[in-house]
Amino acid sequence: LFHARGHGVSPGADSRKPETKSVAQALRPYRELVFIESPGTVDGGDVLVLGKNIYVGLSTGSNQSAIDQMNAKLGKYGYHTQGVEMHDCLHLKTAVTKVDDKTLLINRKWVDVENFEGYELIDVDASEPFGANCLPVGDAIIFPVAFPKTSAKLAAHGYKIKSVVVDELAKAEGAVTCCSLIIEN
């Protein structure tokens, strides 16, 4: 499921498919909804929206059929969707997330930087490979306490950090964006 702002899911895992009904119900008052049809699947953790560009990690939960449908259905809103190959990670947002409109936090070992030309890149600390998942909200970056070296890099770039404990989410390679759905005005 996707709406005109490029958020939502049609998950690849059968166990997650029932979630789409409640998410659609919650989003319907705020956005026009469009749906990804089978055989297309897309997990929210694979979707990175950067302005009018939507990057989808090609994973076990997201496929080319969904990317093609997203281009067809979201193109009328000015969005372009492209697939991104990943290496050794579950989802795209395990490897790269948006810090602000011009800056990304990235683990270069898990995703090719050529996909993100034109953005300033802040590298995770080499000892914190899972530290690339952050969530900008307002004037702050919500960021896991488990990655203090990467947090210090963000702070050195002038970002205000709001630290959170996500140890239980991390056990399933989850992070701050996994439990968040930000609806912009």
Q: Model-found features: residue ranges?
A:
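The feature marks the mature, well-folded catalytic cores of soluble enzymes
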Residues: 1-185
